[in-house]
């Protein structure tokens, strides 16, 4: 929570993944689908270890671990397939316990909700 010097306004900043929703497994499965589509076979445990990194960093780490070179063009395509595969799984995402109550409480106290992507 942050309070500005010249105002009584409050601001709350949440990292969506792991704070409000749990999407780890959906990301793992989406990355597996994307890497397989590029001909890169990886066990899910290897992908799971990299979750939390940006897509580019994750692909660099996986390339180092596997000794495979991934071009910028290939990386862009893999990330696009990941985004599409993840979107296909959106209906399986679940709000973490207490997250909705927290957001409702903030709304009841007239705390503005803003999205930052």
Predicted regions and their residues:
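Short loop/turn motifs at secondary-structure junctions and domain boundaries
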Residues: 3-5
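N-terminal helical cap/lid subdomain that shapes the substrate entry/recognition surface
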Residues: 7-16, 20-100, 105, 109-112
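Conserved small/polar residues in nucleotide/adenosyl-binding loops
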Residues: 114-117
């Amino acid at each position: 929570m942050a309070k500005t010097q010249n105002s009584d306004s409050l601001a709350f900043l949440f990292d969506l993944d792991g704070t409000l929703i749990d999407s780890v497994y959906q990301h793992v499965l989406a990355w597996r689908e994307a890497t397989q589509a590029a001909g890169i076979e990886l066990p899910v445990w290897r992908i799971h270890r990299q979750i939390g990194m940006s897509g580019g960093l994750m692909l660099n780490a996986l390339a180092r671990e596997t000794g495979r070179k991934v071009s910028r063009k290939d990386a862009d395509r893999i990330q696009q397939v990941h985004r599409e595969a993840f979107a296909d799984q959106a209906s399986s995402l679940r709000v973490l316990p207490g997250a909705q109550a927290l957001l409702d409480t903030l709304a009841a106290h007239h705390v503005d909700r803003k999205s930052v992507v």
